[in-house]
């Protein structure tokens, strides 16, 4: 299933802290903006995948307007998309290298 959630990217001295206000406990951090985008997608996919597998309720995403009201000067909203069906397929089809010695 495809999901779209807003993440809050907060700039600090060491890089970025990323949180998803609609998903408690869905947090990550990164050194730069490129890594922040990658890490936010990764943590969102993992959070939603586990929630689906455990049949936990998944909160509906808040609107941009609603979330934008409470931002501070060092925070930015970024829309992140996650496709749990694709993640499951990617996990299932992961290749494994094995070394074998034949006599």
Model segments located where?
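N-terminal segment of the canonical double-stranded RNA-binding domain
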Residues: 1-14, 19
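Short, charged, surface-exposed hinge/linker loops at domain edges
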Residues: 1-4, 45-101
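Non-catalytic surface loops within mature trypsin-like serine protease
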Residues: 11, 22, 82-86
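Short acidic, gly/pro-rich beta-turn/loop elements at beta-sheet edges
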Residues: 17, 28, 90
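Short, proline-centered helix/strand-breaking motifs
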Residues: 21-24, 103
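A short, exposed loop/beta-hairpin motif centered on an aromatic-Gly-Thr core
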Residues: 24-35, 99
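A short, charged, amphipathic alpha-helix used as a generic interaction element across diverse proteins
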Residues: 32-49
